[in-house]
Amino acid sequence: MASDLVESAPAKVNLTLRVLGQRADGYHDIQSLVVFADVGDRLSLTPGADLTLSVAGPGAAQTGAETDNLVVKAARALAARVRQLRAGAFRLEKNLPVAAGLGSGSADAAAALRLLARANDLAPDDPRLYEAARLTGADVSVCLDPRPRVMRGIGEILSAPLALPRLSALLVNPGVAVPTKLVFSGWKPSANPAPVSGGANDLAVLARIPNERQLLDWLMGEVNDLEAPAVALEPAIADVLASLHGAAGCRLARMSGSGATCFALFSSVAETATAAKNLRAQFPHWWISETTLG
């Protein structure tokens, strides 16, 4: 009997996100500093002939039909490029909220590609993995090797991994899903200045940041251009941000991706834990997770 293979699917967090403009194909070019949390989903694979997917966990009810799941889409994209690909039974433990700005579906798809690579003796840098990732979804490529990077284009242009200081953080979602397409459609170019020198595209600046304090200082000069249109769609995001800004020890609070999850950065794990405890008492229906970003 084939033994199970297991991969974690860590949450993706956009520490910065600038929208550079809309392309002729309707998509938007962005630049974003992306890091990964130590919380996420868990995906296992029992190698076999048939491709199947079962989902359990707190977020299972929000994942939709199996045929629409990015795990299945990624597996099929790779099967179209690798002759006689060995697939099997995927089991997804869905811990992250869906449509939440954490790239959880993309992280799951990337984990599926890593599992299939292991099951079929494909090298981690096999170009067919990255082609399948690109065709599966905009964020899948950056999740394939989950390390800090600058992401550009629609997500397909990636920098080399960055050795950034790790950050103590709180992730908070108010229990609402915000459709990415609607958030982008609400973005107004006139309200967003062009990126300045030292922005998220300046790899030299990021490479020279030596410690957590200087990274936090640098991040304060950055933005998420999708925050305003997301708040216009779902005012609960503003409530989350206000609560995070008001937490003792919060250095920075910002929305991740297209929302609705927001993050707050703290100088210590103790401050993060205290903020989490207080917010859970005030807002028991919110999804709240203490984490380390890196």
Describe each model-derived feature in a short phrase.
Residues M1-A100, R118-A123, P127, L164, ...:
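ATP-binding N-lobe of GHMP and related small-molecule kinases
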Residues L15, L43-L45, V71, G105, ...:
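Residue-level signal for inorganic ion chemistry
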Residues L17, D41-L45, D139-C143, R149, ...:
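Short beta-strand scaffold segments in enzyme catalytic cores
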Residues L70, D108, A236:
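Charged catalytic carboxylate motif
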Residues R91-N120, G137-A138, G249-F266:
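Glycine/serine-rich anion-binding loops at beta->alpha junctions
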Residues A109-V150, I157:
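Contiguous, small/hydrophobic- and glycine-enriched helical/loop subdomains that border
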Residues D145, V150-L252, S267-A270, K277-R280, ...:
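Conserved, helical-rich catalytic subdomain that frames metal- and/or nucleotide-binding sites
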